[in-house]
Amino acid sequence: LYSLMNRVEGFSLERGFAPMEDMEKLMRENNIPMFSLESKTPLKEFDVVGFSLSYEMCYPNVLNALDLAGIPVRREERGEEYPLIMAGGTCMMNPVPMERFLDFIVIGDGEEVMVEIAKILVAYKDKTKMERLQLIEGLDGVYVPVLHKGKKRIKRAIVADLNNTEYYEDQIVPYINIVHDRATVEIQRGCSRGCRFCQAGIVYRPVRERSLEKNLELIEKMIKKTGYGEVSLSSLSSSDYSKIDELIKGVKSKNAHRNLGVSLPSLRMNTHSVE
């Protein structure tokens, strides 16, 4: 999303991170509000502040981050001088626990709908919050609590064809060591297994594969742009990808001169082959 939305003319997306307790203590003691990583701009000076929520335990982080940024936590307490507050991610499949704090919520895949939201925000920057929310509400996957009133069922945003969706081949490369210190390509989305314990297997339905040719193309571009020596073939169950053998062989063949490593997360034992 960082790459896709920053390609929208007139729109700038910056990152921010909730601090640990010791840093938060120092920020509060020195009256330092939460700010963005790129330009060090205070969050309350942006037009929109968004949160990506993967787990329910992240909910308090949102409220604390807003408070640290000097932004009222409750939606009805925020006037025109404050940014719109939104959230997305797997935990927003059920937005009700957080709806009193958020202006709008994105439910489902974000690649397409977030770009459309960015275009609306740029085109109607001078409109009131309510006018912008009314325009955003018309998009698939967008839930605006103050406008909804139970009048319709929200249709989850789904990227139907991964091959026709722009991908972030210009992946951000950090200058410190991180846990997943490698290029990452999502080879497929969704899972056909339907294990009852797995939230992601339900949330990311239906199963959609990116073609062998497209995956190889993305990997080639990403390695050239990032300089990584390893690539992760990411999905909920990588060994269920229909052409996993051909993909691995293709990656190794095209990158033999680079000695590129291949990482395969989330493998099922019953789909392993000798090869």
Place the predicted regions along the sequence by residue:
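N-terminal pre-triad scaffold of radical SAM enzymes
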Residues: 5, 173-196, 223
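A short beta-strand-loop structural module common to alpha/beta enzyme folds
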Residues: 10-22
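Conserved, mostly hydrophobic/aromatic
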Residues: 49, 103, 191, 195, ...
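Conserved SAM/AdoMet-binding glycine-rich loop
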Residues: 57, 221-275
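N-terminal [4Fe-4S]-dependent radical SAM core
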Residues: 145-184
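Iron-sulfur (Fe-S) cluster-binding segments and ferredoxin-like electron-carrier domains
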Residues: 198-214
